Amino acid sequence: MMPEASLPILLLMGPTCSGKTALAIEAAQTLPIEIINVDSALVYKGLNIGAARPTEEELALAPHRLLGFRDLTEPYSAADFRADALKHIEQIHNNGKLPLLVGGTVLYFKALVEGLAPLPEADPVVRAEIAALADAQGWPAVHQALAEVDPVTAARLKPTDKQRLQRALEVFRLTGRPLAAFHAEHDKTLTKSRDGLSQFSGLPYPVLSTALAPQDRAWLHEQIALRFRAMLNSGLQEEVEALRQQPQLNADLPGIRAVGYRQMWEYLDGMYGYDSMVERGIIATRQLAKRQFTWLRKWPELQWFDSNDRSQRDALFGLLAKNCKSVFS
């Protein structure tokens, strides 16, 4: 077996509803790999149906790390994910296996391979000041305040993106420097590649980057609609109603803002009718998939496989098997 520092990590990325989890579970049953979840909703406890959490039967066949371990009231950042993932990667390598990181939260994948800019810790006083501004004048006023000091970051954020707006303005008020300047200084990118594996300057391990995604976007949209309706039939409304019974939870928490949960929460708040909730949930999921494609198209040396083509899925499985064999043979 290779020295631990030379052992690769395997990335299986892709848009929502592309079949990543099913393929990963299949692979984990026959290959020397362990799965690490890379989905920002699935890190939270209590988000099951709407987050497409694997069933208990599936988890018995293929356990997932970083799954359902965080309380909904606890923030979980990309930096938190990177720190946790690196610990689990080392453990999996020590177990004589390869980590297969599976999910659609590309921000987490980027944080892992590129590292993160050194930013100041959250400051409760500054956050309270920004929250007071939002309460008094609305989040568009926060967006405008950010645009005046950090136009680059403001241009890529919507006035409704409360969490990121708050963080960007907080960073400026704490440091006097725009968030965009920190990111520009921290340009961690691909440094070299060999035998299909990439070496990123922010990570000590070689990386196999793969994506499972349909070429037919209409097919994906159909799958999104079918799955959202299946979630409703499986009890998504009851799941959210149970969450609403917990007084510490509210609609502004990151987990509750996840696609599907947000629309159901707002429906139960009486903001719109059931049919509108269904339509909004499906549209929001399509928009999520579009954003995921946008991120993935920028990923260096990403190997794409068509999730709607059995032979392509088999080829992806074969590539994972080949990398395992090259390490452990």
Swiss-Prot record:
Sequence positions that bind substrate: T16, C17, S18, G19, K20, T21
SUPFAM superfamilies given in the database record: P-loop containing nucleoside triphosphate hydrolases
Cofactor entry: Mg(2+)
Signal peptide residue numbers: none
Any GO MF annotation of the entry: ATP binding
Function: Catalyzes the transfer of a dimethylallyl group onto the adenine at position 37 in tRNAs that read codons beginning with uridine, leading to the formation of N6-(dimethylallyl)adenosine (i(6)A).
UniProt similarity note: Belongs to the IPP transferase family.
Record's protein name: tRNA dimethylallyltransferase
